[in-house]
Amino acid sequence: MKCLWLLVITVLCLRCDTAGTKPRRGRGSMWWGIAKAGEPNNLSPVSPGVLFMDPAVHATLRRKQRRLARENPGVLAAVAKAQYAFAECQHQFKYRRWNCSTRNFLRGKNLFGKIVDRGCRETAFIYAITSAGVTHSLARACREASIESCTCDYSHRPRAAQNPVGGRANVRVWKWGGCSDNIGFGFRFSREFVDTGERGKTLREKMNLHNNEAGRRHVQTEMKQECKCHGMSGSCTVKTCWMRLPSFRSVGDSLKDRFDGASRVMLSKADVETPAQRNEAAPHRVPRKDRYRFQLRPHNPDHKSPGVKDLVYLESSPGFCEKNPRLGIPGTHGRACNDTSIGVDGCDLMCCGRGYKTNTMFVVERCNCTFHWCCEVKCKLCRTEKVVHTCL
């Protein structure tokens, strides 16, 4: 009997060791499924004031995210608009070997395939652009009164002129007014919603938190002041000014530049120390605010430490030349390329040295369009010849 118990304990220990060394899979964020599928609203159209959530969408959210949706009616529609982040990702990488392809699954963590299991540059961009998308859409939704729990940003106060008109002091030539996009709400809610599940205990979780924060920072710091003049005969005696979000295309351009200059990182020595080395009790859970208090250092000691708006990654990217079903990589076979370019969209790089084929095709397009009063645009149909190069 004693031998039997020893055998059982040995087997259990072996299983525990195996489970401990097995890498975590499916690191992608489940909420991505909302943005992909599109949730029109979380208010019931039948009973006003009653919250409604599609069961399929309900399954993509964690408990905290469902609570945030209940407490802030209208946010799911704003989160769904983060689908622009997917379109922007595909726009930025349409001429690259990895073109940010997504899968038609509702379960969000599978949208980009299992490449998100890898701590590479592409994963860093995915996390940053989706976090930025939520921040951007929420800030705008507040201005449009689409969310019950937030409004325009009225934190700006009127300012007196620095150069008084006509020598009179305190003559206001411009003032804050209008309706500013509520970047404060968008930033805070994105932190609460997007970062749910990222406890900041492992290096990979710290990477995700850093890149999520970088995406939000790009939206926040690129806010622009817009003004409208008021006065007699076109004069600008008074200007009403407000803060406006940048276009999401400009956010995508900035993050793409950060992608090209992303930093490979590791934990700093202070973060590597165990609680026992610091004579502290090991916490059961990292406090919410403390999970952002970490320092990543460059993998190459000759490089500078990454800033708050830089993208960071942990490992080299996989190859994108050949199809890899396990990682969801489609490969570059059949991709269009530019035979005159020496850049990443050129046939030499895009086709990974396999060569390419050239086809001539005829397409029918609208041309010679003219405007006729009122109000019609008439076009002719032209048959044009196009030369298309595709990778072998």
UniProtKB/Swiss-Prot annotation:
Glycans are attached at residues 99, 338, 368. Its main location: secreted. Keywords: Developmental protein, Disulfide bond, Extracellular matrix, Glycoprotein, Lipoprotein, Secreted, Signal, Wnt signaling pathway. GO terms for molecular function: cytokine activity; frizzled binding. It holds the Pfam family wnt. It comes from the Eukaryota. InterPro entries: Wnt, Wnt_C, Wnt_CS. One of its GO terms (biological process) is neuron differentiation. Residues 1-16 form the signal peptide. It is found in: Secreted, Extracellular space, Extracellular matrix; Secreted. Disulfide bonds join 89-100, 142-150, 152-179, 227-241, 229-236, 321-352, 337-347, 351-391, 367-382, 369-379, 374-375. Palmitoleoylated by porcupine. The lipid group functions as a sorting signal, targeting the ligand to polarized vesicles that transport WNT-1 to unique sites at the cell surface. Depalmitoleoylated by notum, leading to inhibit Wnt signaling pathway. GO terms for cellular component: extracellular space. A lipid is attached at residue 233 (O-palmitoleoyl serine). The keyword Ligase does not apply. Ligand for members of the frizzled family of seven transmembrane receptors. Probable developmental protein. Belongs to the Wnt family. This is Protein Wnt-1.
